[in-house]
Amino acid sequence: MGTVPANPFKIIQLAFKETVPKAHAELQKWHQEALKIEDVEIREQAAWTVNDKTFHCEGGSIFALLAGENKDNHIQFLVAYQTICDYLDTLCDKNDAHDPNDFRSIHQALLDCLTPDKPYGDYYQYRDRFEDNGYLRKLVDACREATASFPGFADMQTHMQEVSQFYIDFQVYKHVEEEKREPLLKDFYERNKHFAPTMRWYEFACGTASTLALYCMAAYAAAPVQTAQGQQIKEAYFTWVQGVHILLDYFIDQEEDRQENEMNFVAYYRDSKEMFERFKYIDEKATEKLQMLPDKKFHLLLKTGLYALYLSDKKVMSHPRLKAEAKQLIKLGGFPASLFYYNRWIFKRKIS
């Protein structure tokens, strides 16, 4: 296995030269596959999702630096899996029935990605005359093909399935009728609070809503030499690093969600002071857990990079209050966050 980079300059250089271009190539492939879907509405939704959500795959591709010579297969897995996540999120958003059975059924594809010996689920069984010309199955196949090349997949598989299931549960509860969301998410936390008893229910929801733990596990599973255990990674990324990740995502969406009357978990904080205190606490817990991982400097840099990648978003830059608060939040990332912040341009390409 090659040396894992441990300074921000090297990570940016390798992302620019290796992982982001490979992610773009994979995204281009799936954009072309989406355009083959015969149904106009489904085709437009699938193609739009690939083009609009490139940032998820670009940032996630940096985990491939943990995979040694197996970078390409890891990125194949990551892009296909993330494309499924984003595609299904779009299908849920556009569905007026708010049927949890439907949401679980389509998200079965994510578990099928991690269970290569299992038959495909009947993903669209609750949708009348829904035909994507095999698009979702092709994405599942790409994930299965990639994991077949991961030497450590058997050891990571159960942990990957567990964090995937948490993500699915969150997606189901987030997309049901509006009045049911908060009670379901509160119950979700009560049933699982032993994972993070000092988190609040909406912070725990954020900790389940990310795919970072899965991609980190996949990278170590893909590596020719196994250096990390799934339990170690899960305890660090789920729910602490993922909590930082999705809280930042909700932070930048505050104004947009307010205007559209959408649930926003950062809005549950009483004021900016409480928000900063909770961000700091969750960040400190994430740092503490990451210190226990192999390649800890790499993981710590990725965490600080999250601040830069999100807080440099145009939604923040164009809003005076968010911009002022972002200047305070980015201090949690220190110098590396500032460096990533000023190199945000490498992640601004579009897929066409």
UniProtKB/Swiss-Prot annotation:
Protein family: Belongs to the large terpene synthase family.
This entry's Gene Ontology molecular function terms read: lyase activity
> What role does it play?
Catalyzes the conversion of geranylfarnesyl diphosphate (GFPP) and hexaprenyl diphosphate (HexPP) into beta-geranylfarnesene and beta-hexaprene, respectively. Also produces beta-heptaprene from heptaprenyl diphosphate (HepPP) as a minor product.
What is this enzyme's class at the first EC digit? lyase
Report the InterPro entries cross-referenced here. YtpB-like
**E.C. code:** 4.2.3.188
Q: What is this protein called?
A: Trifunctional sesterterpene/triterpene/sesquarterpene synthase
* Record has Lyase as a keyword: yes
Q: Does the keyword Ribosomal protein apply?
A: no
Q: What catalytic reaction does the record list?
A: (2E,6E,10E,14E)-geranylfarnesyl diphosphate = beta-geranylfarnesene + diphosphate; all-trans-hexaprenyl diphosphate = beta-hexaprene + diphosphate; all-trans-heptaprenyl diphosphate = beta-heptaprene + diphosphate
Report keywords, A-Z.
Lyase
